[in-house]
Amino acid sequence: MATPRLTRNSQQQNRISQGSNSRQTTLLDWKVKDKAGNSKSVLEESSSLEDSNHADDQTEDALQTAVEYFQKGPKKASLSKDSVLEKHLKTVENVAWNNGLAPEAIDILLNVALSGKFGNALSTRILKCMIPETHISEDSVVKAVSWLCVGKCSGNTKVLFYRWLVAMFDFIDHKKQINSLYGFFFVSLQDDTLCPYVCHLLYLLTKKENVKPFRARKLLDLQAKMGMQPHLQALLSLYKFFAPTLISVSLPVRKKIFFNNSKNLWTPALLAVKLRNQGIFPEPLKLQLGPTSGRSLKRKWNYHSVIPAVNSAKKECREKMSLFDYLSNDRSLPVEQLQSFPQLLENIHCLELPSQMSSVLNSSLLLHYVNCVKDESILLRLSYWLSQTLQEECVWYNMNDYQQEKEFINFLDMVIRVQCFLQEGFYSCEAFLYKSLPLWDGFSCRSQFLKLLAWIPFSSFSEIKPLLLDHLAPLFFTSSIYFKCSLLQCLKDLLQNWLLWLSTEAQVQPMTDSPLETTLGGSMDSVSQLIEYIGWLSMVAIRLESSSTLLVHFILDFYEKVCDIYINYDLPLVVLFPPVVFHSAFLSLDATILNQLCYIMYRYRDNLTAAKKKDLVQKAKSEFSISSKICKEFNYYLTALVHCLWSSRPFETGVYIDPQIIENTGETQYKHNLNFVHHPCLLNYAASFLLQESPEEMPVHLSSIRGKKWNWYLDHLYSEGFQGLNLFIKSSIDHSSVSKTEKNT
């Protein structure tokens, strides 16, 4: 039976028409510039276009002849002796690497390669040029896998086929039948040579229903036999994610790159297919066969070309649906027909996701779907793609090229928007940061790097300190105050994301069931250590920047989040700021800093009171008990504030100053110098209050603010926006002492 003619698909025709349109547009532009020779140029351009179409037809005929030859040709032939065979093989290679092969051609050539009818050398060359023009039929892959059971191909051919299958995974139009072969692939793990590549394929295929106890036991046996191999750890981690009770061994908590794709033979070809599918360029992209080198990756970055367009997996093969597809009750909605959020809600049960899952990142509607459905396999595939993109596509990134930097920033901004939308950080971004931070100068892509840092998933402090904080600390100490403030804001956002995750996990499921294998107490220890580390950074920064008002404001902004952990997040943790932070804020010359400090003290008091009440009511079941050290520290801060601001009795507890030193200053009324009236940051408010009360009195006497005027002055401060002072006074000062204070002041 003759092989049907391998015609180009509609997408290739569209590409040719796009090329025609682009030529016409260029011609019109040129026509305006040079009207004299336009007729001749039009004829030449039309002639060249006709020649190009004629050449395409000749190439198509040559490819059809070559494919028919391989399908019907002799069973055994030598490349060195058979010139016809070599000619047809070169034809297939040239077409594959320039334009890609149609699904029908791939179907035939896969059978030829895996049947071994032409020998191992030719099978290897055919597999290396199996590059799709647009997509690969699932039926072709299933038939190719069936040849593995016959034993006609060599071990090297099997390895190359699995490598090809992993590389082309996203271009296969369906995965249902391939997933039904999961058991066959799993059995192939017993082959030591195939094991790394089969693990990679299974990592892409595995769903929750594929995780079975006998398979978990087999993986554990393989690990005991082969040791802690990265590919086995990857599959075990995935199994443990879906079924934590089946995997009892400890695995690395930190996600990493388990599979090395740096030797992927088809990396340039895959990029060309993505660009071609989106119509980025009309002309074929000539690529070199072989592994990708670092130099060849230094191409122009364009994040639109990295992320494929949203297209249904069945878009290219709607006309070839089987009888089973027509009779099936499962009517899926192609993603390209999804136009509105109500339409998403109506079809959320039958939405057909694209085979290239990374295209989801460019669709807000599909991100809504990912967020609602919570399908772990989708997130895993997204994370896998992002991991490979960041680790391999971005290693060539040149910071001295402004255009590349701008496009790279746009790509990172897109990733950040997706993480904010999903309210979840990708482990692949975390691995990228850990790899990049040791080389980061603290300036390039600063905003993007810090935003990515804020979405690092929760983990123990002992793990992130050497990977993250130890690299950030030198930059923090040696950079400008603006970098210090930006990093403090980033760490505040990181803490907030951790707290939200922990509070949600504590409500949804016990912490012992979480993927991090940690108890609530262990999680709180990590959060506490992070806060204490940031407190240490703050103390050093205050000394380096001479208690800068801007810096102290960002530090207190961080502790506004810390002081409300118990009440706002329902987590058993209270951590106070260091004394250096307290005294720098209290002695600041900026009134807003003092107001912010009083508000934080008010919130600390509420959190400690709530924790104490719960501890007394449920003493036997108490989640935690407040240490006496925390209570003593808070009481010291509280007493210092009340004595200085209200009672005018500073330096009575915790601080001792030699009376001779005070006498040498010549200041006899020093006890009043830090109260609400005489505090350096409040002097202008006190003077303004007196001028409003008695405009004719000059000069003003601050000592006159006593008795009723004291209360009026406080009301004046409240009207100026000092609500932190107001809340602190109402919550921490005994109102029975007001009359006594009025007399003493």
Swiss-Prot record:
Residues 39-50 have a biased composition (Low complexity). It is found in: Nucleus; Chromosome, Centromere. Disulfide bonds: none annotated. Keywords: Centromere, Chromosome, Nucleus, Ubl conjugation. GO terms for cellular component: inner kinetochore; kinetochore; nucleus. Residues 1-58 are annotated as: Disordered. Induction: By follicle-stimulating hormone (FSH). It comes from the Eukaryota. One of its GO terms (biological process) is follicle-stimulating hormone signaling pathway. Highly expressed in testis, ovary and spleen. A much lower mRNA level is found in brain and lung, and no expression is detected in liver, kidney, heart, muscle, pituitary gland, prostate, epididymis and seminal vesicle. InterPro entries: CENP-I. Residues 1-27 have a biased composition (Polar residues). The keyword Ubl conjugation applies. Sumoylated. Sumoylated form can be polyubiquitinated by RNF4, leading to its degradation. Desumoylation by SENP6 prevents its degradation. Component of the CENPA-CAD (nucleosome distal) complex, a complex recruited to centromeres which is involved in assembly of kinetochore proteins, mitotic progression and chromosome segregation. May be involved in incorporation of newly synthesized CENPA into centromeres via its interaction with the CENPA-NAC complex. Required for the localization of CENPF, MAD1L1 and MAD2 (MAD2L1 or MAD2L2) to kinetochores. Involved in the response of gonadal tissues to follicle-stimulating hormone. Component of the CENPA-CAD complex, composed of CENPI, CENPK, CENPL, CENPO, CENPP, CENPQ, CENPR and CENPS. The CENPA-CAD complex interacts with the CENPA-NAC complex, at least composed of CENPA, CENPC, CENPH, CENPM, CENPN, CENPT and CENPU. Interacts with SENP6. This is Centromere protein I. It comes from Rattus norvegicus (Rat).
